[in-house]
């Protein structure tokens, strides 16, 4: 287990590297983030950001999504892949948000994960970015990098990683920390190469310290 001092150093160093941590998906309304995250499954954020402006122009309200057919939404998101499943989830989710929540995205883990196509990763992102709650978005970058750093035991299971991070991260730092790990994972600590020689986290990184 990392010392509190080591965890704090890692958190602070990432702040220096990425002071403006934010979700890379573009949105203006709470449900737009929810739908964008659904589209991002097996798709890049960059591609999603290319698709969503025209999607939200075609369906400018939650009611428009709820009244659309799966095929209509699917045609608008085709380039994001798996459009048949994603379009169904989006339309059904829009209906539920209107019928049960007055058109607002709910603000609890239990309510969010009960919706079609929403898992803990998406729910954490909504809780953190929309509601400002402590949130632990355990995507592939987070899982890989926290394992290399030694913040977790190296588990590849998102729920296990989330539980371990909840035990060591200051809650108020959690959401931005996970956003910064995404940027760090794209820029420096990639899946193919860790780039330890020039890494500012190396002194506190189990993987980095083991490299010669």
Where in the sequence are the language-model features?
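Catalytic cores of DNA base-excision repair glycosylases
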Residues: 2-212
């Amino acid at each position: 287990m990392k010392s509190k001092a080591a965890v704090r150093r890692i958190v602070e160093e990432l702040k220096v590297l990425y002071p403006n941590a934010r979700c890379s998906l573009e949105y203006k309304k709470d449900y737009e983030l929810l739908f964008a995250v659904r589209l991002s499954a097996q798709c890049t954020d960059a591609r999603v950001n290319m698709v969503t402006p025209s999607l939200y122009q075609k369906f400018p309200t939650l009611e428009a999504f709820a009244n659309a057919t799966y095929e209509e939404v699917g045609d608008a998101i085709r380039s994001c892949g798996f459009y048949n499943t994603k379009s169904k989830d989006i339309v059904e989710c829009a209906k539920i948000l209107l019928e049960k929540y007055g058109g607002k995205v709910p603000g609890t883990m239990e309510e969010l994960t009960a919706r079609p196509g929403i898992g803990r990763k998406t729910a954490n992102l909504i809780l953190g970015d929309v509601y400002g709650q402590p949130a632990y978005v355990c995507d592939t970058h987070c899982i890989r990098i926290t394992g290399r750093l030694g913040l977790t035991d190296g588990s590849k299971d998102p729920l296990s990683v989330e539980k371990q991070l909840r035990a060591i991260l200051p809650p108020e730092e959690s959401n931005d920390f996970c956003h910064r790990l995404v940027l760090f994972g794209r820029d420096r600590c990639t899946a193919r190469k860790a780039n330890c020689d020039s890494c500012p986290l190396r002194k506190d990184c189990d993987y980095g310290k083991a490299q010669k």
